[in-house]
């Protein structure tokens, strides 16, 4: 459950460490975002020498969320942190590596490149 002003960790090697959600994409009344949803965010913390700088506005897809997500078989999945991966306008990841596990729901939402780069899909 990510909403405006939520802070997320960045799970890729673009140079951003933390982002702040400024808009959940998908309609003017859309309040919350879950795993696999795209958000617009600003970079709050970045490593020196990275591809993105602090203050830059980026698009990101949520790969881990603390709020549990129900699966079609009735099971639930939740993570210890909220994390996102920065993406380009064509939904391809901006980084070349993904850190930590990602949810299987990304495959259903057509983020195949992120799923293939991830070390573990849960």
Swiss-Prot record:
Where does the source fall among the domains of life?
A: Bacteria
Per its UniProt record, what Pfam families does this chain match? Ribosomal_L14
Task: Indicate yes or no for the key word Metal-binding.
Answer: no
Name the keywords, alphabetized.
Ribonucleoprotein, Ribosomal protein, RNA-binding, rRNA-binding
Q: What InterPro entries does the database record attribute to this sequence?
A: Ribosomal_uL14, Ribosomal_uL14_bac-type, Ribosomal_uL14_CS, Ribosomal_uL14_sf
GO molecular function list: large ribosomal subunit rRNA binding; structural constituent of ribosome
One GO term of the cellular component aspect? cytosolic large ribosomal subunit
Q: A GO biological process this protein is involved in?
A: translation
Function comment: Binds to 23S rRNA. Forms part of two intersubunit bridges in the 70S ribosome.
- UniProt subunit comment: Part of the 50S ribosomal subunit. Forms a cluster with proteins L3 and L19. In the 70S ribosome, L14 and L19 interact and together make contacts with the 16S rRNA in bridges B5 and B8.
Its recorded name reads Large ribosomal subunit protein uL14
């Amino acid at each position: 459950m990510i909403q405006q002003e939520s802070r997320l960790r960045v799970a890729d090697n673009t140079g951003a460490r933390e982002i702040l959600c400024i808009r959940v994409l998908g309609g003017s009344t859309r309040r919350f975002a879950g795993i696999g949803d795209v958000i617009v965010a600003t970079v709050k913390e970045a490593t020196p020498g990275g591809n993105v700088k602090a203050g830059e506005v980026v698009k990101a897809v949520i790969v881990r969320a603390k709020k549990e997500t129900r699966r079609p078989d009735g099971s639930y999945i939740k993570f210890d942190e909220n994390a996102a991966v920065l993406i380009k306008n064509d939904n391809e990841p901006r980084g070349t590596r993904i850190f930590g596990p990602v949810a299987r729901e990304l495959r259903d939402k057509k983020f195949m490149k992120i799923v293939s780069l991830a070390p573990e899909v849960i």
